């Protein structure tokens, strides 16, 4: 217990002060507006009433939030219209959203300072060819072949709002800022309840994207911080951890010690550490814990995690959220793929002098398969096909021009091929390509009030084929040192696109 407290105090000693005054600096909200609401496009900050933005209005909004009438209304009537006075200039939803984004930027400052304070001599070199999230797959192919068990963890998130505030107290000791955060959370939810309503949570997430990401990453980093402590105490072997792997940043070289880092709290979602016995990968609210050893050891780690969430974060997580499987006999859902490590037979001919004989060996192989049923379900939900995969037209797009229709269908088709390009079996991708191509033809035929056969005879199938194979031409130019191939043929090459981050949302392709 003393080791645990000492380990925790190291983080508490780096608390930050005087964050609250920054909330009244106008340039903070200019950054929030440009970066949080309108991406990277610089725009003039103008309200709904066409009045210039002023930090004085933010100050008034904060003062009104502290008034008793507002608090009573937000707590006792959480479901009524939160725009108490829509015509009131400084009480509009626009400024509430700006204040939320500005607050998130301000509280991220201490973590950014911590990143800048890292020693320069330990700067990790960047590898341009490993910047994609898909560079994790070669790592899995290299390491998972030698492991025995895998735990698939759904990181529990429904947590009491007060716990989220308390977690920040370890690193931010600015009482006014923490009070303001409490008022903001009260603004959307009653303190006597949990965030178990998915409708209310998604509403809060939609209006406060940056703040939600910061709170979520704060919670996850706290959980992983003490998970590392448990890992250090669970083995007497010398520990030599790899550094953090952050999405679109770099692979790190072997370091003597593993240090917790908090760079880019708003967007970085992938992180792993490893040692000779255990590997940890986190992505999109899920985590994978793979290791050697016995089944009893994995059960022990499962109990560790359940008790940790219960006694440290004060909420109960169901044991079924942690699945333990043997790698050789099961598959797991990972980033839109069904991955497994099966044993494949390999027949080898051996020649000894005048005698020859065959040796049948079984080799492990990291296999990735496209989930056909899941992807067809997404296409069906988006009204490109029926539930059984039969292509249908998309009436809502018939008002678009022919080129826009072709462009939309073609972009979806190419994105699906991009994201699942590393699959070991391409039959599912060819089926998806057929569904999208025929759905496009039926949509165009419906627009021109014709049949698919008549429309295709008039237009010719060559144009559609050329449109959908445009990406294949780029594909062959990108890999000139390898054997060229066409998507229309059969091949077994597995190529992970290195620019996949731009369409990373295709893990759930059409949502």
UniProtKB/Swiss-Prot annotation:
The keyword Nucleotide-binding does not apply. Its main location: plastid. Usually encoded in the trnK tRNA gene intron. Probably assists in splicing its own and other chloroplast group II introns. GO terms for cellular component: chloroplast. One of its GO terms (molecular function) is RNA binding. One of its GO terms (biological process) is mRNA processing. The gene is matK. This is Maturase K. It is found in: Plastid, Chloroplast. InterPro entries: Domain_X, Maturase_MatK, Maturase_MatK_N. Keywords: Chloroplast, mRNA processing, Plastid, RNA-binding, tRNA processing. Belongs to the intron maturase 2 family. MatK subfamily. PANTHER family: MATURASE K (PTHR34811:SF1).
């Amino acid at each position: 217990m003393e080791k645990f407290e000492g380990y925790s105090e190291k983080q508490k000693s780096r608390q930050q002060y005087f964050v609250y005054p920054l909330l009244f600096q106008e340039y903070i909200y200019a950054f929030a507006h440009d970066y949080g609401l309108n991406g990277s496009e610089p725009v003039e900050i103008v309200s709904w009433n066409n009045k210039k933005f002023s930090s004085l209005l933010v100050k008034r909004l904060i003062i009104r939030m502290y008034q008793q009438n507002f608090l009573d209304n937000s707590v006792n009537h959480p479901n009524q219209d939160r725009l108490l006075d829509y015509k009131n200039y400084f009480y509009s939803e626009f400024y509430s959203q700006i204040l939320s984004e500005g607050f998130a930027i301000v509280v991220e400052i201490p973590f950014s300072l911590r990143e800048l304070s890292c020693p320069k001599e330990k700067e990790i070199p960047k590898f341009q060819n490993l910047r994609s999230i898909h560079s994790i797959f070669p790592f899995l192919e290299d390491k998972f072949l030698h492991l025995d068990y895998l735990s698939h963890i759904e990181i529990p998130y429904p947590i009491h709002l007060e716990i989220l505030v308390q977690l920040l107290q370890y690193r931010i000791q600015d009482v006014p800022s923490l009070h303001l955060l409490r008022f903001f959370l009260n603004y959307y939810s009653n303190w006597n309840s949990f965030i178990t309503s998915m409708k209310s949570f998604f509403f809060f997430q939609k209006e406060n994207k940056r703040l939600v990401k910061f709170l979520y990453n704060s919670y996850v980093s706290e959980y992983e911080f003490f998970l590392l402590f448990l890992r250090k105490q669970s083995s007497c072997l010398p520990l030599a951890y790899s550094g953090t792997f952050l999405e679109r940043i770099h692979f790190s070289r072997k370091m003597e010690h593993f240090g917790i880092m908090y760079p880019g709290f708003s967007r970085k979602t992938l992180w792993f550490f490893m040692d000779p016995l255990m590997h940890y990968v986190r992505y999109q609210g899920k985590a994978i814990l793979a290791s050697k050893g016995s089944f009893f050891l994995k059960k022990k780690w499962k109990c560790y995690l359940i008790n940790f969430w219960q006694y440290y974060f004060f909420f109960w997580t169901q044991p079924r959220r942690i699945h333990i499987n043997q790698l050789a006999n099961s598959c797991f859902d990972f980033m839109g793929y069904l991955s497994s490590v099966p044993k494949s037979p390999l027949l080898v001919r051996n020649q000894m002098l005048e005698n020859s004989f065959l040796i049948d060996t079984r080799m492990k192989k990291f296999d990735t398969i496209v989930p056909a049923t899941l992807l067809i379900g997404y296409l069906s939900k988006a009204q490109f096909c029926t539930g059984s995969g039969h292509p249908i037209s998309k009436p809502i797009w018939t008002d678009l021009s022919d080129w826009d229709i072709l462009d939309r269908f073609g972009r979806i088709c190419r994105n699906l091929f991009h994201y699942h390009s590393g699959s070991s079996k391409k039959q599912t991708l060819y089926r998806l390509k057929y569904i999208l191509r025929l759905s496009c033809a039926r949509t165009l035929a419906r627009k021109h009030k014709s049949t698919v056969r008549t429309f295709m005879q008039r237009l010719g199938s060559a144009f559609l084929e050329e449109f959908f194979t445009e990406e294949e031409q780029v594909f062959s130019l990108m890999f000139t040192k390898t054997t060229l191939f066409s998507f229309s043929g059969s091949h077994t090459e597995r190529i992970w696109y290195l620019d996949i981050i731009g369409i990373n949302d295709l893990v759930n392709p059409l949502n």
